[in-house]
Regions:
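Short strand-loop-helix active-site module centered on a catalytic nucleophile
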Residues: 73, 88, 110, 131-194, ...
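Catalytic active-site module of serine/aspartate enzymes centered on a nucleophile-bearing elbow/loop
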Residues: 293-311
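Serine-hydrolase catalytic core
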Residues: 227-284
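A fold-wide structural signal in alpha/beta-hydrolase
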Residues: 86, 115-119
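Short beta-strand element of the alpha/beta-hydrolase
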Residues: 84-93
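Catalytic nucleophile-loop/oxyanion-hole region of alpha/beta-hydrolase
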Residues: 99-100, 106, 119-154, 292-298
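Hydrolase active-site cap/lid region
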Residues: 172-228, 244
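A glycine/proline-hinged amphipathic helix-loop "lid/cap" segment
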Residues: 1-81, 310-311
Length: 311
């Protein structure tokens, strides 16, 4: 298989104010979690449902709640979008927090940029439901979209952070079953390493406003429990076989602690012959596309993503 790769580093810097919105939100969350170590899951979810705040409402996008494949979801429907092209979006939040509502605006921006529709899943969350429930919900939604008449190759699995993990795992699960999978996969700042390793967990610890090894350890315990191997490929795609995997677009912020989750993923996928694009946002935080509508870097990123998607 021929390997086609490109690596791009965003060269336009957003103004300080636009960048501070996301960094400051993360800093506020970190301060609250540090001051309230026994914060319950209900309050933690309420906190992370504010994730949409840095994102400007996308123009010309309407929303519709639905249930597909038994999974509650929100459709993001840009004016003039090709409804035969679907972005199956899995939200981030350590598999435990975040929701379709917290990611609605971000998914709407991406759909508008590429000219498709987005379908944001409210998959079952940990700790009430452990791995592989989240992957199963993603596959069920994928199957239902195909059953409705959407061609598998016209579906893109896409997600951020833990949702980026799921976007990859859904495609891996379908491939392992010998079934047609998505035509492409997109991962924003994917969180993949369930062993909680990585050089940038240390080197970017002082620049990442949200992610810490301790925070990740708690999320890992919630989703894997005592029974799931942290090296299981559908839980930790860094151990997956990427032979025959769809083309892949990955973004990460240069100052985030999970940066080398992305770079290790790209290395592994490239070694298997996957067509990979890696885009690193200089000076950007975890899931910096949340700055959509207020950041020149994100506008440039979405232009690159749209070109990649259409080609």
């Amino acid at each position: 298989m021929t390997t086609s790769t490109s690596e791009q580093t965003a060269g336009t810097h957003a103004g300080p104010a636009s960048q501070d919105v996301l960094r400051d939100l993360y800093a506020d969350w970190s301060a609250i979690m540090a001051a309230t170590p026994d914060l319950g899951i209900r309050l933690l979810r309420s906190l992370f449902d504010e994730w949409h705040q840095p994102t400007v409402e996308p123009q010309g996008v309407t929303y519709r709640e639905d249930t597909v494949g038994g999974v509650p979801s929100i459709w993001c429907l840009p004016e003039g979008a090709d409804k035969s092209k679907v972005l199956l979006y899995t939200h981030g939040g350590g598999f435990a927090v975040g929701s379709a509502a917290s990611h609605r605006k971000l998914a709407g921006h991406v759909a508008r940029a590429v000219g498709a529709v987005s379908f944001v899943l409210d998959y079952r969350r940990a700790p009430e439901f452990q791995h592989p429930a989240q992957v199963e919900d993603g596959v069920a939604a994928f199957d239902a979209l195909v059953a409705s008449g959407i061609a598998p190759q016209d579906i893109t699995t896409i997600g951020d952070s833990a949702g980026g993990n799921l976007a990859i795992a859904i495609a891996l699960s379908l491939k392992a079953q010998g079934r047609p999978g998505p035509g492409s996969v997109v991962a924003f700042s994917p969180w993949l390493d369930m062993e909680n390793k990585g050089e940038t967990l240390v080197t970017n610890n002082d620049t990442d406003a949200l992610i810490t090894p301790e925070l990740l350890e708690g999320m890992i315990a919630g989703v894997l429990g005592d029974t799931v191997d942290p090296k299981a490929p559908l839980a930790n795609p860094l151990y997956a076989d990427f032979t025959g995997f769809p083309r892949l677009y990955v973004t990460a912020g240069s100052v985030e602690s999970l940066l080398d989750n992305s770079t290790r993923l790209v290395e592994r996928a490239r070694a298997a012959g996957v067509d990979v694009t890696l885009s690193i946002g200089e000076g950007q935080q975890h899931v910096y596309p949340f700055l959509a509508g207020r950041s020149a870097i994100v506008a440039e990123e979405f232009d690159k993503l749209a070109t990649w998607y259409r080609n």
